Amino acid sequence: KYVGVEIAKGFVEDLQKRVKVLKETYGEASVDFVLNDIRNYEFKDCSLVTSIFTLQFMSKKDRARVIQDIYNGLNSGGGFIFAEKIDCENARLQDMMTFNYYDFKRGKFEYDDIMTKERTLRHMLKPNTWREIEDMVLNAGFKTVEQSWRNHNFIGAVAIK
C-alpha cells in the first residue's frame, strides 16, 4: 500500500484525482493521499518512506523528531529516501554554490523570478549541513545513510534501518 501525506488541502484534492486516473488505468492500485502534517502522522509498518524537499522547512527539533518517527515506523531493513537543500559548512563555498546555482537557473528563468522565489523561501527554509543531516539520521538509529545524488546545494540520500 502507498500513502502520500500532504499538508495542503488543494494538493491532496489534486492528488486524489490522479489516484482515480491511476486506478482507472491500472486497476485497483493501493494508493491513497491523506491531508496531514507529517509532524503529526503516525508512520507504522512501512517498508519505504520518501521525503522530497520537506524536512528543510521544519525546525531542527521537529526535523529530528520526524526522522525518529520515520525510523520507528519502518520495518527492519526498511529504507528512507529523502532530498533536501543543504548549507555548506564553509561560508565561501556556500556563496560559490549559491551564485553558481543562480547562474544555472538563469538559463531557465528570469532574474526577477529567481530573486522573488529566493525572498519568498528565505524565511521558511531551514537548511542544515550534510554532516548535521547525517548525524540526525544516524542518531535516530539508522544503520547507514549515503548520499545518492547532489546538484549544487541539493542532495538526495538513502538511509537503511
Region annotations inferred by a language model:
Residues 50:
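A conserved beta-strand element that flanks and buttresses the S-adenosyl-L-methionine
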Residues 134-161:
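Core SAM-dependent methyltransferase catalytic element
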Residues 64-76:
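A short glycine-rich, Lys/Arg-flanked "PGG" loop and its adjoining helix->strand segment in the class I
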Residues 1-40:
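Class I SAM-dependent methyltransferase SAM/SAH-binding core
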Residues 53-57, 84:
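Short catalytic micro-motifs in class I SAM-dependent methyltransferases
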Residues 46-47:
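Conserved acidic residues
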